[in-house]
Curated annotation (Swiss-Prot):
GO CC annotation, single: chloroplast
Keyword Chloroplast assigned: yes
Keywords tagged on the record: Amino-acid biosynthesis, Branched-chain amino acid biosynthesis, Chloroplast, Magnesium, NADP, Oxidoreductase, Plastid
Organismal lineage: Eukaryota, Viridiplantae, Streptophyta, Embryophyta, Tracheophyta
Cofactor dependency: Mg(2+)
Protein name, UniProt field: Ketol-acid reductoisomerase, chloroplastic
Length: 14
């Protein structure tokens, strides 16, 4: 997930 949909930036391989 990303901080674009108001979600917490999870430590994932974007």
């Amino acid at each position: 997930f990303y901080e674009k949909e108001g979600l917490p930036a999870f430590p994932m391989g974007k």
